[in-house]
From Swiss-Prot:
GO molecular function: adenylylsulfate kinase activity; ATP binding; GTP binding; GTPase activity; sulfate adenylyltransferase (ATP) activity
Chain intervals for the UniProt region annotation (G2): 89-93
The entry's keywords: ATP-binding, GTP-binding, Kinase, Multifunctional enzyme, Nodulation, Nucleotide-binding, Nucleotidyltransferase, Plasmid, Transferase
Official protein name in the record: Bifunctional enzyme NodQ
Record's signal peptide: none
Amino acid sequence: MSYVQSIPPHDIEAHLAEHDNKSILRFITCGSVDDGKSTLIGRLLYDAKLVFEDQLANLGRVGSPGAANGKEIDLALLLDGLEAEREQGITIDVAYRYFATSKRKFIVADTPGHEEYTRNMVTGASTADLAIILIDSRQGILQQTRRHSYIASLLGIRHVVLAVNKIDLVDFKQQVYEEIVADYMAFAKELGFASIRPIPISARDGDNVISASANTPWYRGAALLEYLETVELDPTDQAKPFRFPVQMVMRPNADFRGYAGQISCGRISVGDPVVVAKTGQRTSVKAIVTYDGELATAGEGEAVTLVLSDEVDASRGNMLVAPGARPFVADQFQAHVIWFDANPMMPGRSYILRTETDSVSATVTTLKHQVNINSFIREAAKSLQMNEVGVCNISTQAPIAFDAYNDNRATGNFIIVDRVTNATVGAGLIDFPLRRADNVHWHALEVNKSARSAMKNQLPAVLWFTGLSGSGKSTIANELDRILHAQGKHTYLLDGDNVRHGLNRDLGFTEEDRVENIRRVAEVAKLMADAGLIVLVSFISPFRDERRMARELMEEGEFIEIFVDTPLDECARRDPKGLYEKALAGKIANFTGVSSCYEAPENPELHIRTVGHQPNDLALAIEEFLDRRIGGQMTPLQRPT
């Protein structure tokens, strides 16, 4: 079966113009595993005669059940293109398909149902106007049904089709259908959907997919395709204020300067005023340039180069916006975060936050609560696990321009990237800026770090000792502190155990508390360095991310990481505090090296091995290195072995 439409040559231009004027509906299919999402879209395309003959022939070659005798085709294979998907019979990646009918154009995203691939579902839902949520008639509402419904609501999808699938497997019973619809309506009343349209279907056999089925005489509503062709979208979705993220400054010659990018939303015309979001500079559009020539006006989705009437500071990472509807510019905001990674989200840990325009270092300062997707109850939590949703306060290293996600999906979202693996570990939807950021200002001080350092006749530095418990960190740091003090240096030693008696007495030894422990100490060390001191920090600090965060707080060259490398068995043999004995007996939880991991530094400034060396000798070696370092003599490191 193939779809061929005969168009007389003289009508081609009229047909293309009519096609261009059709509205576009972006929708997703979602739900639990094996609810029939891919099969439904395959059936929709097949029965609407929108599948080409070569695609049908290919289904037989990939071994779809029944294809050889022509009686049955596995329509899910039209969407499941990955080899792993076909082998396992599940959807893994997001499959996008474009098709059109006489009434409307469609872009459909077939998203995976397995919990492990929730991140892919979020990707598909982020641009959708409508969600088809499938439910297996035999199983009813499952946890993944609830999760996908909640995420669809969170991502701003306003319209839902509740496709009660496999109705044939329950003998087309109206009671089963109505019970599922009632259960879902009760669940979804808190989600704020503008419309929910229930439809009983059989994706495999085509009941109520393209046309009404004789098997469900008790259902008098529209078939699925008919509803998709006629559902009305919110008009406000088509009228957002102008937003233009600058992707590149075009400077082909001295007489031309243009700002290239894609219009996120809204429209712009030659002569319209615009504002640079971060600086507030005002100007107007002198010309709109494209590859095909200049335009008088341009709108959402178009890639253009804007030539401005004045020279302004609008480099990559900034945004040109409408003067009467400017975005927020702030470095603190509240957001809903969906966590993707197997490693939990840690408040206090430094991540990379990427928006449509910016890429900045960011920290989750507070996890306010986790959202229970079954009951929507707010629950206290210290971290977010994979596929969990939480409300967080986030702080960025520099101000970013954004809108609230509910007002503008294009400029109100972000992703969170792990600094080590560069993997996308989370996605976020901005709720609102935190006004506290506007009320706190830096106060200019007459006496600065340089003045304090000059008075002490030394350069400030932060010597960060890291290693296992019992490695000798504190012993070596204490000996070095004694040597430097004898030389008249102004120092201070921050010891892990001592700090936990005061500043960090409220923290335990869970991974979340360890992250916060190091964050606080790093901030204290920064203040002490600002006072012109040589700061010795002796903490296990087991995670690379937190040591990197501490380094980034300091000025270039100020942070010196010292890896005190002692084998675990030697640390356990020494066991000066009896902690290893307790940990190995199961009496201490989350003990580094035994029941909690230690991430060794990959490229420390100093790597010292303690076995066979006296603490005093190692302290002297560090002192010699420090003398060269803060004295400006940057000779190659002579690491003690």
